[in-house]
Regions:
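Catalytic cores and adjacent flexible loops of soluble metabolic enzymes
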Residues: 1-244
Length: 244
């Protein structure tokens, strides 16, 4: 985003004195993005979406498989030198709607390669929200032990009505790291369904609480942030409609 640096500047300025600095992940898709993220105060971790779909990789980042892998290796070296964390998201991990080859063995091969490069934090991503809860659970269960020493999380997109079931399927399979977004803000333009987006943080927390998990976050404490997010979404939704 063109004003990411200004957003981070205002965010840091607004932190109450004595507040522990949260982890901030800067998502990048090319070298220029990496340079900006590393130079932005407050960014603690670099994130990169590595797609195992050739079509999606071209559409999202205009890269070949070789170019994308070379960038991952560059990210690993740069973050090691700078002291930043690094997480790679395996995009299209749960299936491929573009009639390309897909299978658990492709995901496993990618995980093994990422470990060999030096990655220790990887997330399986359902980029277009086409996985069922059963698929989420079965793939995670199959992948969690194939790369010892790698913390494996999930980054799931979903329609609201199926979101909690997918979270619980991953949790029951052993996942302990989940990505979410307040009110389900954001998503992927390639999903082809306006109702598919990031799973809401509040949905994830409620689902995990139903399993007795101690997530360290009180839902009631999130209420003001959720309300603010809803106001922002409404504001920009109305602005977009006015432009149309």
């Amino acid at each position: 985003m063109s004003d990411s640096e200004e957003v981070m500047k205002r965010f840091l300025a607004g932190l109450p004195p004595g507040t522990a600095h949260p982890e901030i992940i800067g998502i990048v898709v090319n070298e220029r993005g990496l340079e900006r993220a590393l130079a932005t105060p407050g960014v603690t971790t670099i994130g990169y979406p590595y797609s195992i779909s050739a079509y999606f990789r071209r559409a999202n980042a205009n890269m070949s498989r070789g170019e994308s892998r070379a960038l991952v290796e560059e990210l690993r070296k740069a973050t090691k030198d700078s002291g930043h964390g690094l997480v790679v998201y395996i995009s299209m991990a749960f299936g491929n709607p573009y009639e390309e080859p897909w299978g658990a063995e492709i995901v496993e091969d990618t995980l093994v390669w990422l470990k060999d490069v030096g990655l220790r934090n990887v997330s399986l991503a359902d980029t277009v929200g086409n996985a069922s809860a059963e698929q989420v659970g079965s793939l995670y269960a199959a992948m969690k032990d194939c790369v010892e020493g790698v913390e494996l999380g999930v980054h799931l997109h979903s329609r609201p009505e199926g979101a909690a079931e997918k979270v619980l399927a991953a949790y029951d399979a052993g996942c302990r790291r989940f990505d979410g977004a307040l009110t389900g803000l954001g998503g992927c333009p390639f999903a082809g369904d306006d109702l598919v987006g990031n799973i809401a943080t509040e949905t994830i927390l409620a689902a995990l609480a139903s399993r007795g998990a101690d997530v360290g976050v009180r839902l009631e404490a999130l209420a003001p942030a959720i309300a603010m997010t809803e106001e922002i979404r409404a504001k920009y939704s109305h602005a977009e409609k006015a432009i149309q």
